[in-house]
Regions:
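Intrinsically disordered, low-complexity regulatory segments
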Residues: 2-197
Length: 197
């Protein structure tokens, strides 16, 4: 009986230790911080060209399906592991190398839903690596709360101020009121905020 209890405690201690190693990543995600090891994401869809230079990997994404053709270039350190190879066809928002994504970039390229999905996948990855199963719905509530504010770009005829952070509902209500009066609505960008803000 005593030995069994010792084993359970010991195993519990090991699991606890492993979870704490993943907590900085979860905290980074919940606080919407820029990761230390960043991976660029493709801003456009297209075909990949990879060239190895002394400075690093030069990854060029070309979209020739549109006129005029679009091209984006990314320099990736040789120490990073590429997630794309020469000749690959990729979508806008695809990760180009190992590392983590900057939420601001993900928001610009993948939009709000894509950013919310990325957050949930990344948070689940940390917990699942420790053998902990948590339903997505718990994280969905947190992620929804992190993304329920907008930052005002132009106030139009509303009572809102440029740069002000407001709830999305208040923004929509204020715009509806102004539009009903024939005025100019405000414009805003979605803001992903850390849970302590």
């Amino acid at each position: 009986g005593t030995q069994l209890t010792m084993r359970v405690r010991h195993a519990g201690g090991i699991v606890g230790l492993d979870v704490t190693q993943g907590l900085p990543r979860v905290e980074e995600l919940f606080e919407s911080r820029t990761p230390r090891v960043l991976s660029p994401i493709a801003e456009i869809a297209g075909k990949v060209e990879v060239t190895e230079t002394e400075e690093g990997y030069k990854v060029v994404v070309k979209n020739t399906a549109i006129k005029p053709p679009e091209e984006r270039e990314y320099m990736i350190p040789l120490t990073s592991e590429l997630k794309v190879k020469d000749g690959d066809l990729i979508a806008a928002g695809d990760q180009l190398s190992s590392g983590y994504l900057d939420l601001k970039e993900v928001l610009l390229v993948r939009g709000l839903r894509g950013t919310q999905k990325y957050l949930i996948i990344e948070i689940q990855r940390v917990y699942e690596s420790q053998g902990i199963q948590i339903s997505d719905k718990h994280f969905e509530v947190i992620v929804r709360k992190m993304s329920d504010k907008v930052r005002i770009d132009t106030p139009g005829d509303t009572m809102l101020l440029p740069g002000e952070l407001v709830d999305r509902m208040r923004f929509q209500e204020e715009n509806a009121r102004v539009l009903a009066e024939g005025g100019e609505p405000a414009t805003a960008q979605v803001a992903i905020l850390g849970i302590t803000r």
